[in-house]
């Protein structure tokens, strides 16, 4: 199946299905000499893994990663790195009632018409389970970017359904199951999800992720713009229906006198561009927001058709996230890291010798 690989110099090929024996990825292009073990990758997978709260799928997968190649005596060799995650808690029988029908809003219908067949067990190749290997690959990219450029990543939920989540500080993100940068609204979010689960329905979310410390100059003009590649990879995340860079769609209501980020010798005065101008990084924080649609696998009966095109009623009884966005923050961080890692290597290959007599200005004013 095409469409399973991303990147130019740091390439990641994803493989597996939701209810197959295992899922994983092959990373081709990781520079040699970096220390790497499963212990460097597992914490990121643990942030994403299912079954960690009552608000997510109760499929209990340990998501224990195995490094099969590309590492010798604790260091990357420069050859392809294969990461494997074995599936241990499949319940394929839960999907028996949808083998002959299509779930509204799901890839069942489009996969059937494209390939002439589909794997109904947990969505097969279209399952969000396939994001786990990308989080593993993202952990490798994060480690290299931090060690070589001091780049850090952070993210959190900005909205759950119709509830806007006020930003109170990134320090709150690890303290709640929603990855919310907020301490005062968690009870409201929990009550909302408890009621939703009883209704047998689902809801969407908005997630914001940032990369700090990205140098100025990464990205390419026109069709390989840094923000274009970011949008491309974010749209590859299951259930994402919208991507914003910086001010995004709010830019429509801005005046040019406000929107353009003014430069001073002391630093930028704002960051409406989200850290990218002309497809090239400015040295400011790269800020990305994604919109995630409601989960399509729900218990609420809905109208559909069967494989013969006849009317059918669909109910889904498998274990699913009532909101895919609850576990999306570490996934979006990983995807952003993969894009930046690829562009870091591309920039080094073409422009690594470029030197200017004047240093870049600060990402923001000292008191900002």
UniProtKB/Swiss-Prot annotation:
Binding site for FMN: 125-127, 238-239, 278, 293-297, 319
Pathway(s) served: Metabolic intermediate biosynthesis; chorismate biosynthesis; chorismate from D-erythrose 4-phosphate and phosphoenolpyruvate: step 7/7
CC cofactor note: Reduced FMN (FMNH(2)).
GO MF entry, a single one: FMN binding
Catalytic reaction annotation: 5-O-(1-carboxyvinyl)-3-phosphoshikimate = chorismate + phosphate
Keyword line: Amino-acid biosynthesis, Aromatic amino acid biosynthesis, FAD, Flavoprotein, FMN, Lyase, NADP
PROSITE patterns attached to this UniProt entry: CHORISMATE_SYNTHASE_1, CHORISMATE_SYNTHASE_2, CHORISMATE_SYNTHASE_3
InterPro entries the record matches: Chorismate_synth, Chorismate_synth_AroC_sf, Chorismate_synthase_CS
Coiled-coil segments on the chain, per record: none
Record-level GO cellular component terms: cytosol
GO BP terms in the entry: amino acid biosynthetic process; aromatic amino acid family biosynthetic process; chorismate biosynthetic process
Sequence positions that bind NADP(+): 48, 54
Alphabetized NCBIfam families for the sequence: aroC (TIGR00033), PRK05382.1 (NF003793)
Oligomeric and partner information: Homotetramer.
Similarity annotation: Belongs to the chorismate synthase family.
Name of the protein: Chorismate synthase
Organism: Methylibium petroleiphilum (strain ATCC BAA-1232 / LMG 22953 / PM1)
Organism phylogeny: Bacteria, Pseudomonadati, Pseudomonadota, Betaproteobacteria, Burkholderiales
